[in-house]
Amino acid sequence: MKRMIALDGAQGEGGGQILRSALSLSMITGQPFTITDIRAGRAKPGLLRQHLTAVKAATEICRATVEGAELRAQRLIFRPGTVRGGDYRFAIGSAGSSTLVLQTVLPALWFADGPSRVEVSGGTDNPSAPPADFIRRVLEPLLAKMGIHQQTTLLRHGFYPAGGGVVATEVSPVALFNTLQLGERGNIVQMRGEVLLAGVPRHVAEREIATLAGSFSLHEQNIHNLPRDQGPGNTVSLEVESENITERFFVVGEKRISAEVVAAQLVKEVKRYLASPAAVGEYLADQLVLPMALAGAGEFTVAHPSCHLLTNIAVVERFLPVRFSLVEADGVTRVSIE
């Protein structure tokens, strides 16, 4: 019997990423874990619907036995079984992030006995989680270089607080992991601005695009009007395509915040990324830790290691026989496997 790994959910950033990473790694390695003080660092601690859906999805995919899978629970015991490929559907029942549920189970399905399709309904445009286009256009091309083949499709948008969105991913077992080397971003090739609208006046999008164009030379400016019943909602995105990597940044519009202020938040975030020679943005760095650890080698550069990144590394090192090295030099932090 494999040893039980004990995790403190209050460590580091104290959010849901500790639980999501633990579920992924437990399914992959077969190691059971117990976690206490789940999401202790959040205003509403414990399992919310999104986290509970991730637990239930993991349980179904590997036939796990679990204790504490209840709303607002702050302690969970998870004993994994064998990961099985198949056609899975999960509903969050709120505007909780569909992509974060996918993020939890897809790594385990890289090791399944056959191809899989996972469909999750819930929120797709959430201010605290990556939208599906980030997964499609930024993360999945990098995963493909690592030998990981998955394809995400956004079937329906779902904005906060209504939800109702649907995202699906098709994924195949990995035959061989390749290492990823992302030391330099390279020169910028082009930048693309994009606005999504659902049940929001078009002039909002036009003002947001104008704000982006006032700070950057945009190769493309796209406004997409979604069906009114998918809203109300508004998301502004800016994609930076460089020689070695494509990064994508976004801000979700909010009531009583002007279009100019929303777009200015995005401008600030992109300028912060471009001010450093680092290849990888803050959020993408979190996403690369697990596949890089599974490959057993690789590196990337990031401007500053976030608390999220450090916490994720700490969890990965509890489950896998790897050690990460973080070295600061020349205005970046180089993250690699020792």
Swiss-Prot record:
Among its keywords, does the record have Transcription? Answer: no
**Enzyme Commission identifier(s):** 6.5.1.4
The record places the active site at: 308
What catalytic reaction does the record list? a 3'-end 3'-phospho-ribonucleotide-RNA + ATP = a 3'-end 2',3'-cyclophospho-ribonucleotide-RNA + AMP + diphosphate
Is-annotated flag, keyword Heme?
A: no
Gene Ontology biological process terms, A to Z: RNA processing
Classification via Gene3D superfamilies: RNA 3'-terminal phosphate cyclase domain (3.65.10.20), RNA 3'-terminal phosphate cyclase, insert domain (3.30.360.20)
Q: Where does ATP bind?
A: 103, 283-287
Q: Where in the cell is it found?
A: Cytoplasm
Q: Name one GO cellular component term.
A: cytoplasm
Q: Which UniProt keywords apply?
A: ATP-binding, Cytoplasm, Ligase, Nucleotide-binding
Say what the protein does. Answer: Catalyzes the conversion of 3'-phosphate to a 2',3'-cyclic phosphodiester at the end of RNA. The mechanism of action of the enzyme occurs in 3 steps: (A) adenylation of the enzyme by ATP; (B) transfer of adenylate to an RNA-N3'P to produce RNA-N3'PP5'A; (C) and attack of the adjacent 2'-hydroxyl on the 3'-phosphorus in the diester linkage to produce the cyclic end product. The biological role of this enzyme is unknown but it is likely to function in some aspects of cellular RNA processing.
- Protein family according to the UniProt entry: Belongs to the RNA 3'-terminal cyclase family. Type 1 subfamily.
Name recorded for this polypeptide: RNA 3'-terminal phosphate cyclase
